[in-house]
Amino acid sequence: MPRDIITFQCTECKNRNYTSTKNKKTTTERLEMKKFCRHCRKHQGHKEIK
């Protein structure tokens, strides 16, 4: 199965808030998105972690 589950971590408070899937064969670099962090209560950058 080429798609793997990834987790996104808030860059400010380091909480793991979101999960998603990605194809690691076509997208080798780590993703970064702006999403709403419930703990910070504002939009923050979220980076992909293992």
UniProtKB/Swiss-Prot annotation:
The keyword Protease does not apply. GO terms for biological process: translation. InterPro entries: Ribosomal_bL33, Ribosomal_bL33_CS, Ribosomal_bL33_sf, Ribosomal_zn-bd. One of its GO terms (cellular component) is cytoplasm. One of its GO terms (molecular function) is structural constituent of ribosome. Keywords: Ribonucleoprotein, Ribosomal protein. SUPFAM superfamilies: Zn-binding ribosomal proteins (SSF57829). Pfam families: Ribosomal_L33. Belongs to the bacterial ribosomal protein bL33 family. PANTHER family: 50S RIBOSOMAL PROTEIN L33, CHLOROPLASTIC, LARGE RIBOSOMAL SUBUNIT PROTEIN BL33C. This is Large ribosomal subunit protein bL33. It comes from Solibacter usitatus (strain Ellin6076).
